[in-house]
């Protein structure tokens, strides 16, 4: 807003889209009305060390890597944090409509729609990078994470939706 309010010679009518880039992973749990239920859990948070071991044991480290091209690491992959929430904050897990990263939060605030791009999804432990760019029912079933709580997937270049954020619209963006 500072850049827009200071002028800086911007012609807002020339802005055709807004790209989103964010720290990854930074896991957020969203309620039914889009409210953030817990502070985002960042990549450096190590509280889910035990959950990383549970994922590796349930799926198998070789199988997990075969499906996701990743391993389970506390904080560094958000699946461990999702499982931590399920095990330690069950009331939050039950209230969660979708899990997503910080970019999901930004998209939701701007468009009213939940989404994750493939690159962010690849940090979740639940995304098939080798099997069709989709959420893995195999891994979710083994770990006990409800697939319905994972957001719709998009390419990084896809349009999430139209701008509905009144603050941004009030600044002249469309």
Language-model region placement:
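N-terminal glycine/serine-rich phosphate-binding loop of ATP-dependent small-molecule kinases
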Residues: 1-39, 50, 95, 169-174
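Generic beta-strand or strand-like secondary-structure segments
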Residues: 2, 50-54, 84, 105
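Gly/Ser/Thr-rich active-site cleft segment
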Residues: 30, 65-174
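Hydrophobic or amphipathic alpha-helical targeting/insertion segments
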Residues: 32-36, 54, 58-59, 64
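Residues that scaffold the ATP/ADP-binding catalytic core of kinase and kinase-like folds
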Residues: 39, 51, 55, 109
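Residue-level structural signal for beta-strand termini and adjacent loop
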Residues: 41-42, 120
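Carbohydrate-associated surface elements
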Residues: 45
């Amino acid at each position: 807003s500072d850049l827009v309010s200071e002028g800086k010679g911007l012609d807002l009518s020339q802005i055709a889209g807004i790209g989103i880039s964010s720290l990854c992973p930074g896991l957020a749990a969203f309620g039914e009305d889009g409210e953030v239920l817990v502070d985002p859990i960042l990549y450096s948070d190590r509280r889910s060390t035990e959950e990383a071991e549970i994922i590796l044991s349930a799926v198998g480290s070789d199988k997990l890597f075969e499906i996701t091209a990743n391993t389970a690491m506390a904080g560094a992959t958000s699946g461990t944090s999702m499982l931590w929430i399920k095990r330690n904050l069950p009331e939050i897990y039950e209230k969660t409509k979708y899990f997503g990263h910080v970019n999901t939060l930004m998209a939701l605030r701007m468009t009213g729609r939940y989404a994750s791009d493939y690159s962010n999804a690849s940090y979740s432990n639940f995304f098939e990078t080798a099997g069709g760019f989709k959420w893995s029912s195999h891994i979710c079933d083994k770990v006990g994470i409800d697939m319905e709580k994972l957001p719709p997937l998009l390419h990084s270049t896809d349009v999430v939706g139209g701008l509905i954020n009144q603050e941004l619209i009030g600044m002249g963006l469309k």
